[in-house]
């Protein structure tokens, strides 16, 4: 059993404070009875919660760490390619989606969830969530490039990336850390410095 205000907040009906106010105004019903107490206990999978006459669908949040393979796209549906959701059909009915995207030829860690608030926190640059990639590349890395990564690199469309970190493991192998996710960003960052990514995996 869980508090009604907690469940409704998780379902994005408002902040915890806003939801409490809505309940006190009688906006919600449980099993046909109008509820006015925000701490009213319900079983979200067994009780019927309604708002303005419509039944609220409740899904428990799920969090999946997927090692995305190559040739699979980061989408919920595609008529041509296999998607990450196709790899886990048992979760499709829970309205899960990938948090961000990896290019079709990129492998590695991808979070799958139905928690929109978490997805926003992970994707928004203002939260500074670092993403780490292992890569191999062709070309010559120069020490002065470290300054470029730290200050931001100007891409082919004129966009300047946020500061990143580049860590050489050995010749033509490195880790790169970024906290944004522009289209083909890692590949384009290296191309701006006359290097070419030959393999990319988020770790």
What are these model-derived regions, one by one?
Residues 1-203:
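Basic, flexible Lys/Arg- and Gly-enriched helix-loop patches that mediate nucleic-acid binding at interfaces
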